[in-house]
């Protein structure tokens, strides 16, 4: 049996020889100058997002939306069947009352994300990495896997395949099948080498996004646990991003992975095969994929936050108009009933459709129909409503 050994080929490349799994190489495997422009755009967008007004109402709503979306996405990637709305509803429940393993997976992910956020930095530091401790990996897998009816996946315990027992990752539809290391001695040795590589001087000083996504990539290749590797790997990526100030986008990117799931899975195999063939820059495509995802994600967060800010300003103006008697209580309630109806029906309404709603009928009880239409006209005149293609729009 070959002896285990490690050797640094250069400042950023660590070659590991295992007992039974052959050689394993940790490397950057990309050209920075080919992604620098996109990396700069990502960091500029994140920096602007971090500097947005920290209004509690805005932050809380963004946080709730990102939490539900992130957990829905990472759970769906692993085969979860809940919708995003069902996920959001389950997350609002007391975890102590939840009995089903499928639902516990969601609350476990919520607890994991909350634990990661304890290490979050408010200041963006894209080139200032912090050490990643092996204990964090075990803690994240424990949080992800705790209290589930899965005896085959002990929380925080490394995988150790019995003789003849196979572990297969992936499928032909997503770029092929991969068989990760099986021997627990090899898995332990590789995980220790992975952390050594991550924390080495020339890797920890790499752009945080690059370091984070490569931490995720190599963790998945080692595949150290029986189950929960995907969820844990994405949380590790999130942890490293949060350490460097990539707030909210660190987990919101999971939506991008889920939306582009075929490319996400296929790139793991494609990069692995390119490395095996000793091609130049085998990790380039995965890094570019993550950078594109980060940029799209942060721009989406900007849009969501701007929408919430505009809504907050709208509500303030509406309250001021009511207080100064520019609009009546009935007109104020008309707008709120319209907003509720739009939210419940997920579509805009015409004036006639709105008038038929029971809440509006109750609001105008004892009034002639013309009063309703006069109120609508007044609210349009004051720019609290607008009309496009016969449909009522909140705002102008």
Put a short name on every predicted segment:
Residues 1-396:
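FIC/Doc superfamily catalytic core
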């Amino acid at each position: 049996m070959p002896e285990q050994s490690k050797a640094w080929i250069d400042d950023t490349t660590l070659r590991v020889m295992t007992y039974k799994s052959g050689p394993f190489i940790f490397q950057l495997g990309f050209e920075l100058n080919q992604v620098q422009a996109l990396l700069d755009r990502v960091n500029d967008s994140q920096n602007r997002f971090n500097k947005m007004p920290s209004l509690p109402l805005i932050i809380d709503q963004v946080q709730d939306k990102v939490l539900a979306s992130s957990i829905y996405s990472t759970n769906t990637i692993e085969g979860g069947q809940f919708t995003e709305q069902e996920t959001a509803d389950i997350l609002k429940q007391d975890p102590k009352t939840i009995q089903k393993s499928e639902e516990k997976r969601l609350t476990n992910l919520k607890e994991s994300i909350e634990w990661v956020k304890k290490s979050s930095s408010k200041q963006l530091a894209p080139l200032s990495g912090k050490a990643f401790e092996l204990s964090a990996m075990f803690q994240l897998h424990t949080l992800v896997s705790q209290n589930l009816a899965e005896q085959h996946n002990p929380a925080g315990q490394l995988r150790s395949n019995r003789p003849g027992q196979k572990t297969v990752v992936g499928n032909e539809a997503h770029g092929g099948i991969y068989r990760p290391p099986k021997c627990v001695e090899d898995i332990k040795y590789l995980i220790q080498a992975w952390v050594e590589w991550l924390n080495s001087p020339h890797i920890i000083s790499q752009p945080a996004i690059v370091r984070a996504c490569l931490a995720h990539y190599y963790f998945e290749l080692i595949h150290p646990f029986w189950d929960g590797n995907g969820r844990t790997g994405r949380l590790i990526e999130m942890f490293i991003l949060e350490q460097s100030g990539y707030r909210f986008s660190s987990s919101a990117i999971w939506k991008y992975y889920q939306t582009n799931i075929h490319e996400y899975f296929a790139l793991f195999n494609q990069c692995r095969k390119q490395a095996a063939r000793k091609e130049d820059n085998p990790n380039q495509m995965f890094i570019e994929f993550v950078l594109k995802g980060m940029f799209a994600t942060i721009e989406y967060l900007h849009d969501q936050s701007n929408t919430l800010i505009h809504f907050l300003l709208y509500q303030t103006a509406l309250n001021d108009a009511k207080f100064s008697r520019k609009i009546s209580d009935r007109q104020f309630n008309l707008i709120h009933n319209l907003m509720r109806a739009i939210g419940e029906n997920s579509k805009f309404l015409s004036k006639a459709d709105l008038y038929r709603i029971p809440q509006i009928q109750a609001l105008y009880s004892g009034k002639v129909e013309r009063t309703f239409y006069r109120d609508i006209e007044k609210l349009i005149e004051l720019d609290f409503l607008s009309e496009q293609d016969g449909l009522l729009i909140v705002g102008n």
